[in-house]
Design a protein with these regions (language model features):
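Thiamine diphosphate
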Residues: 2, 168-191, 211-222, 240-440, ...
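N-terminal amphipathic, basic-rich helices that act as targeting or association modules
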Residues: 2-155, 421, 492-509, 513, ...
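Glycine- and acidic
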Residues: 5, 22-25, 72-80, 96-106, ...
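Non-catalytic terminal/interface segments that mediate subunit docking, oligomerization
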Residues: 70-91, 111, 126-129, 136-137, ...
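Residue-level marker for buried hydrophobic side chains located in beta-strands
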Residues: 227-228, 256, 519, 625, ...
């Protein structure tokens, strides 16, 4: 196999010319499709006989769009260069001023490399939201935020005081370090940091837009999703996942603009290779339309004179480490080390000065080249487009950081470097003002200001801008879930089954049904959802082009363009990205959808925690359902599947409301309240609810427990002479109930049993009360909900859950004046039966009894012989392994 950048020798130039002349003849008489067909036939002929063929998957290291196919630039380049200079300066100034006065820093080099990529888009392509058009969606590369603020300052949307408060948000007048809708809810639309989140969420956003159109929830408007990405972040697995879905789904509404400045945070992205060629091969293989913007217009004349192809060969020979180094040097160095390898190339630039050679730019810094790439991208049909734009990191920073490995961390520039920056971009800043680094904008009545405003007006308004005005939904009353509120009798069901029935009720609701978005990562049958296949269908952009194997069955695998289920395959990152798109639809599409993403709970927050955090940042509204939850509840799977900590992980996300219900009625109350809060009151929160695959009978909902269910705890059973308070959630609540019965039968100890539906919400309530009391020392102290529930009750508190002890420990600070015992499933999961696992992790009914007796004995309320009796009675192995140590 011949490597892509190798130069292959021609043994018979005459024969080669004859073949090329033949192809040229076909091109001129019958066009490119016929020529490509003939070439494909030749390749197929060879492969059929020899079984393999080395085919080049990359194109030469030159611009994809030739000069003779370029469109004339539609804007006033002189004015745009002027406004571009203002924005560049302001982006630099706000970082330098922040570093000078507060030390909070910022990044200069990324936007410096991408300024033209953004400005051409803002001036000519990015369409804002209007009354008749929903607007394009633009994902801004996180480290470019200073430039976006600099532009907003020129637009009059951000004040000088706000620029001075860059990265100083606590006072309420600052600007967030990166795009964060949670912190700037009227400005930023999409969180794109940490790196890799932008590509995958943008790709699934584009797919969700198509989903809405296929289901007739939104009209096709020709909207585009633009994602600005860095070449370094494309190494993230999420970035590569985005490649697959974009090509497979033929998302021609998606445009990736990859800023190939060849540098990541510490050094070159691919110092020993060519990152643009690598990306081209990846994206082309995935079915994307790739446009390379490598060289600025200054190279056109040289390439035209390159009759031998030696310049193109030299361009291919150099690796990215060379190209980065060239831009950290000067024109003389480039002449010697780039052109100087071959005498013919030195002759090619003999009439150029070193300064002229130095000014030969990268394609991403040439507005004309960038415009043509964008114009081709928006015209292209049937494929997503990826624009690979070569730039220089730190462009314009000169010796202070241009093309240097350290430029990502640069927060400061010396006086001479600032002066050089000013002179390079022709800005009018007096020498005596340089120390102040003033912000710049054109005069309000200037030609630049009028042009600048007119461009955005022509494109429909400002971008980015986040919109939230949307009509609240009409949700069903709790009585709609009457089946879940009733006693199941002897019929045993799981809470997962109860959820599927609740979902079925919602899908049939005349007001809400079509807005429900079920999302599953290839586990529908595990969760008992296969009945929905035929009922509402599985979404597929091409419908169903085959006869499914189970076509004769009632619940066959039905795919359709207007299918409602988003079946994501074994792809949790993609599934939650679809969920993020659906859960922010109210803002991005002016339509409130109700997404339910159900997954193995172990493969939720642990697997995609960064995306779950980003969902909170994006102000997502929706339901996450962690099925097969609990360390001991999922039988036979073991260490990697048994979840004993998803509630710990969900608890760290401030806007995530988490519940671990045991009974169907609890689940119905929680889901109904979640819909009220998110889709009627429009709170920017989302819900995480764990579901079980253990079947057992469910009681009817007792009177008056709704408030307790939602606040986090309520009494399930009470005894007037209760000596201890037993609490549990999820599957272990039933062990707590059984333990209460054993205590009464075997030891004549009475207890109250509490269903603790949300230890996380109880903790948050307790901390809120503590904070209020801290800040209001002269007022009557408030009491937490836990304290209110336990008021008038006696005895220690024993809490048992199917999660780590830390989960129960959340309420320890709010249990005052009594002993508190937490039982949990710390340690790695094991594969076994539920009964064995609960004994192994010491959360079964016998260990709950033992822990209760020990607490009572420690308080001097019973003798210690009772503890020993329990060990003997229940056959507890006191020498068993500590589950944490296994």
């Amino acid at each position: 196999m011949t490597p892509n950048n190798a130069v292959r020798l021609d043994d018979d130039p005459q024969e080669t010319r004859e073949w090329l002349e033949s192809i040229e003849s076909v091109l001129s008489t019958e066009g490119r499709p016929r020529a490509h067909y003939l070439i494909d036939q030749l390749l197929d002929f060879d492969v059929a006989r020899h079984g393999d063929f080395y085919g080049r998957v990359t194109t030469p290291y030159v611009n994809t769009i030739p000069v003779d196919r370029q469109l004339p630039y539609p804007g006033n380049l002189a004015i745009e260069r002027r406004t571009n200079a203002f924005i560049r300066w302001n982006a630099m100034a706000m970082v330098l001023r922040a570093g000078k006065h507060s030390g909070v820093g910022g990044h200069i080099a990324t936007y410096a490399s991408a300024a033209v990529l953004y400005d051409v888009g803002f001036d000519h392509f990015f369409r804002g939201r209007t009354d008749s058009f929903d607007g394009d969606l633009v994902y801004i590369q996180g480290h470019s935020s200073p430039g976006i603020y600099g532009r907003a300052y020129l637009e009059g949307r951000i004040s000088e005081a706000q620029l001075d408060n860059f990265r100083r948000e606590a006072g309420g007048e600052g600007l967030s370090s990166y795009p964060h809708p949670r912190l700037m809810p009227d400005f930023w639309q999409f969180p794109t940091v940490s790196m890799g989140l932008g590509p995958i969420t943008a790709a699934y956003q584009a797919r969700f837009m198509r989903y809405l159109e296929f289901r007739d929830l939104k009209q096709h408007q020709g909207r585009k999703v633009w994602a600005f990405l860095g070449d370094g972040e494309m190494d993230q697995p999420e970035s590569l996942a985005a490649i697959s879905v974009a090509g497979r789904e033929k998302l021609d509404n998606l445009i990736f603009v990859v800023n190939c400045n060849l540098q990541r945070l510490d050094g070159p992205v691919r110092g020993n290779a060519k990152v643009i060629q690598e990306f081209e091969s990846l994206y082309r293989a995935a079915g994307c339309n790739v446009i390379k913007v490598i060289w600025g217009g200054g190279w056109d004349a040289l390439l035209e004179k390159d009759h031998s192809g030696l310049l193109r060969q030299r361009m291919m020979e150099c690796v990215d480490g060379d190209y980065q180094n060239y831009k950290s040097q000067n024109g003389a160095y480039v002449r010697e080390h780039f052109f100087g390898k071959y005498p013919e190339l030195l002759a090619l630039v003999a009439d150029m000065s070193d300064d002229e050679i130095w000014k030969l730019s990268r394609g991403g810094h040439d507005p004309d080249k960038v415009y043509n790439a964008y114009a081709a991208a928006v015209r292209h049909k049937g494929q997503p487009t990826v624009i690979l734009a070569k730039t220089v990191k730190g462009f314009g920073m000169g010796e202070a950081g241009e093309g240097q490995n350290i430029n990502h961390q640069l927060k400061k520039m010396g006086a001479e470097a600032v002066k050089a920056f000013r002179d390079r971009f022709g800005l009018e800043v007096a020498d005596d003002q340089l120390d102040e680094i003033p912000y710049l904008k054109p005069a309000a009545d200037s030609e630049e200001a009028r042009y600048f405003a007119a461009r955005r007006q022509a494109l429909g308004g400002y971008v980015p801008a986040r919109h939230t005005a949307v009509q609240s939904l009409q949700i069903p009353e709790l009585s709609a879930f009457a089946t879940q509120l009733k006693d199941t009798g002897e019929r045993a069901i799981s809470t997962t089954m109860a959820f599927v029935r609740i979902l079925g009720t919602l899908l049939k609701d005349p007001h809400l049904g079509k807005l429900i978005v079920p999302i599953v990562p290839d586990e529908s049958r595990t969760f008992g959802m296969e009945s929905l296949f035929r009922q509402i269908g599985i979404h597929s952009a091409v419908g169903q082009l085959y006869t499914p194997q189970d076509a004769g069955q009632l619940s066959y695998y039905k795919e359709s363009k207007d299918g409602q289920i988003m079946q994501e395959g074994l792809n949790e990152s993609g599934a939650i990205s679809s969920w993020i798109a659906a859960s922010t639809s109210y803002s991005n599409h002016g339509l409130m959808t109700v997404p339910f993403y159900i997954f193995y709970s172990m493969f939720g927050f642990q697997r995609v925690g960064d995306l779950a955090w980003a969902a909170g940042d994006a102000r997502a509204r929706g339901f996450l359902l962690g099925a097969t939850a609990g360390r001991t509840t999922l039988m036979g799977e073991g260490l990697q599947h048994d979840d004993g900590h998803s509630h710990i992980l969900s608890s760290v996300i401030p806007c995530c409301v988490s519940y671990d219900p045991t009974f169907a009625y609890e689940l119905a109350v929680i889901i109904r309240e979640g819909m009220r809060r998110m889709y009627v009151e429009q709170e920017d929160i989302y819900y995480y609810i764990t579901l079980l695959n253990e079947n057992y009978p469910h009681p009817a909902m007792p009177e008056g427990v709704e408030e307790g269910i939602l606040k986090g705890m309520y009494p399930l059973s009470s005894h007037p002479q209760a000596q201890v308070q037993l609490m549990g959630s999820g599957s272990i609540l039933r062990e707590v109930i059984a333990a209460s019965e054993l205590l009464d039968k075997d030891f004549a100890i009475h207890s109250n049993v509490w269903s603790v539906t949300s230890l996380t919400e109880l903790r948050r309530d307790g901390h809120a009360v503590e904070r209020w009391n801290l800040l209001h020392p002269q007022n009557e102290p408030r009491t937490s909900y836990v304290e209110q529930c336990l008021a008038g009750q006696t005895g220690p508190v024993v809490v048992a859950t199917d999660y780590m002890k830390l989960f129960a420990d959340q309420i320890r600070p709010f249990v005052h004046g009594r002993r508190f015992v937490a039982l949990g499933t710390d340690g790695f999961g094991q594969s076994d039966t539920r009964e064995t696992l609960r004994e192994f992790f010491e959360v079964d009914r016998h260990f709950i009894v033992l822990a209760t007796l020990k607490a009572l004995a420690d308080d001097g309320l019973i003798g210690r012989e009772n503890v020993s009796e329990a060990i003997s009675r229940y056959g507890i192995n006191v020498d068993k392994a500590n589950p944490v140590a296994v």
